[in-house]
Regions:
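N-terminal cap/leader regions of alpha/beta-hydrolase-fold enzymes
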Residues: 1-242
Length: 242
């Protein structure tokens, strides 16, 4: 039996900054968990909206968040880097922006504010991990797909309360074996309940069907994406207590 879904664009703010997200909600009288979808370096695009549809088809609220600001999207590598780098360089700034998305999710109609999870792709994977590091209220799980593992260096990390899982292409040039080991060390030191799934023969951006530039280190790999998504569905059931 198919689930009836409601789709809407939502406006929210981080201080004076206007943000625009996309939400897909299953029609239900019960409160539903929320899964934030954190975009890659281009900003929110059709891929993220499709992920929100997938999340809603599982019975959860899918919320494709906006880190950059309403209407701010990259069109090439240079403009994408210009949008992303200020957040990479100032992780306190990024954390504030991400927590604005948590605040928005917590007050959505039909949302269960005690069961919020985030998934993210590339830069968005770093965002999902930063939400785990922030111990945001009601936050129970983070999934990073081909994410960046650079720690935020915002002082002493308190114990991470949510569960964490990373799906990593072993041949990803943007997350080297040294970075992977540092991530494992960081998560262990933070006493996180964490998992790392390394996928052999897999580059960066392996979930994105539009990624096809091995010389830049990015390439879609359908079997890797399928394995990651199947594992994610089990992870959702675990962290949401189903």
């Amino acid at each position: 039996m198919s689930i009836e879904l409601r789709r809407e664009t939502v406006q929210y703010r981080d201080g004076a900054n206007e943000l625009e997200g996309f939400v897909v909600t299953p029609q239900s009288n019960a409160l539903r968990p929320v899964v934030l979808i954190c975009h890659a370096w281009r900003g929110t695009e059709e891929f993220d909206r499709e992920r929100a549809e997938w999340i809603a088809s599982l019975g959860y609220i899918g919320f494709a968040i906006d880190v950059y600001g309403k209407g701010r999207r990259g069109t090439d590598n240079s403009s994408c880097a210009a949008l992303m780098n200020p957040f990479i360089e100032d992780r306190a700034f990024l954390r504030r922006r991400l927590l604005a998305s948590i605040a928005c999710a917590s007050t959505m109609q039909g949302a269960d504010p005690t069961r919020i999870c985030a998934i993210g792709f590339c830069f968005g994977g770093l965002c999902a991990l930063d939400l785990a590091r922030a111990n945001a209220p009601g936050f129970v799980g983070a999934i990073a797909y081909h994410g960046l593992f650079t720690p935020p260096n915002l002082g002493v990390q308190s114990p991470i309360q949510s569960k964490v899982i990373a799906y990593h292409g072993w041949d990803d040039p943007m997350a080297t074996p040294d970075a992977v080991l540092a991530f494992a060390t960081e998560m262990t030191a933070a006493r996180a309940d964490w998992q790392l799934h390394a996928l052999g023969g897999t580059l960066h951006a392996f979930t994105n069907p539009q990624a096809n530039d091995p010389s830049f280190g990015v390439q879609y790999r359908a079997i890797a994406a399928q394995r990651a998504y199947q594992g994610s569905e089990a992870f959702f059931r675990e962290v949401f207590g189903e």
